[in-house]
Amino acid sequence: MRGLRLATMTKAPTSLAHWGAFTADVRDGDIASVRPIEGDEDPSPLLGNLPGSLRHSSRIAGPAVRRGWLDDGPGPSSRRGADEFVAVSWDDLTELLAGELRRIVDTHGNEAIYGGSYGWASAGRFHHAQSQVHRFLKMLGGYTFSRHSYSLGATGVIMPRVVGTHDDLFKRSTEWNVIAEHTDLLVCFGGVGLKNTGLNHGGTTAHPARNALRRFRDRGGRIVSFSPLRDDVDGDCEWLANVPGTDVAIMLALAHVLATESLVDRAFLDVYCTGYERFERYLLGVDDGVPKSPQWASAICGLSADLLTDLARRMAANRTIVTVSWSLQRVRHGEQAPWMGLTLAAMLGQIGLPGGGFGHGYGSINETGLAPLRCRLPVFPQGLNPVQTFIPVAAVSDMLLHPGEAYDYNGLRLTYPDIKCVYWAGGNPFHHHQNIPRLRRALARPDTIVVHDPYWTAMAKHADIVV
């Protein structure tokens, strides 16, 4: 919005935020109200946070440098997050930042700059903060980067080995309209939280999930929700409050019923899958002597064996989608839930049929269930990174606290680099990173932290140079 002359405008053009498309009404140089784009059947109420945001007290008024860094120069500091900031001119900031980047590159090499810069700063493509900072750092000679996401760290590693890229898994998911018209039974591990469908990376112009589920129910469709939370599904459902973390045991029990009652679609497995025979040996306990039966799972998950047996039979008798929320893979051994969910759906043999199959992310983000784009949208080119060093995105604290230490990732033996500069644009790891006190200790280690942001987020307050 900085490029708009808001003081002289009364109506801004249509804009796109993560929560949807909208038109802003402007008064006295600030956003007075917003109106969702016409045709959005269930606009997100979070758009209501935009009024007043341009002049909010948390806005960063201009470039600033942390007092300790300005007085003492670059170096590790436990004062980050508590020190005061000094306003500087754009010319002075540019000179300070350029000099520090050149010092780090000349002394330690480009690998010493961490530019993962994870965050959701902008729904636009040209104004996408990560794209801009990555392009900038590549032009500088490269940087240590990050892979995958906090939302889908385990999925991003396992699913390409099982079914293809997880990106295609979401973009080619069964559309909500197809579910409303064809699905009989929606079996949800982790629920379908409609609150999460309010937003989408890159923005969105439609929120179809709520009305699609209403039409699904009106047609007689049933929802089974495995979750410790009743409101993980909006409206009527069969809520099964299993012990948290036992979803894979439940899936195995359902698969056991299919296998022992001849409900497996062998023809589908023979044509489209490989490895079922090996999996079935484990499922039936041939090698370890432990059949993964409903009775076995009942002692683990807290649900009755009869209930699980009945559900498996209903799944085989109806057009069924097995959906696994992203939350299930954000734990240790998180790769097991989406992998087993897909296996269960393959045993039913309904993948590819209207209203049947597997889903991963319904109720986790708005994209899952949207009609796919017919062509790829343009993106801002970033160029090539000469530095090949990377970390899994959620390992930033480990990297800063243990430089030079070896670790295992996705079949590789890697080493954490020695980072001297953390460069972040439009992101705030304090709102999604695990173990915040440990993150604070880690951020005391680099020589310099640079943050680009319009607001004084926790990350901006831990910076040395704020742009």
Predicted feature descriptions by range:
Residues 109, 123, 303-305, 309, ...:
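Gly/Pro-rich turn-and-neighbor structural signature
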Residues 116-124, 296-300, 325-333, 364-365, ...:
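Conserved short loop/turn motifs at secondary-structure junctions
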Residues 118, 271-275, 314, 357-369:
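A glycine-rich phosphate-binding loop feature that marks nucleotide/adenosyl-phosphate handling sites
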Residues 108-112, 264-269, 352-359:
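Flexible, glycine/charged-enriched surface loops at secondary-structure junctions
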Residues 129-215, 219-226, 249-252, 346-462:
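Extended redox/cofactor-interaction regions of prokaryotic respiratory oxidoreductases
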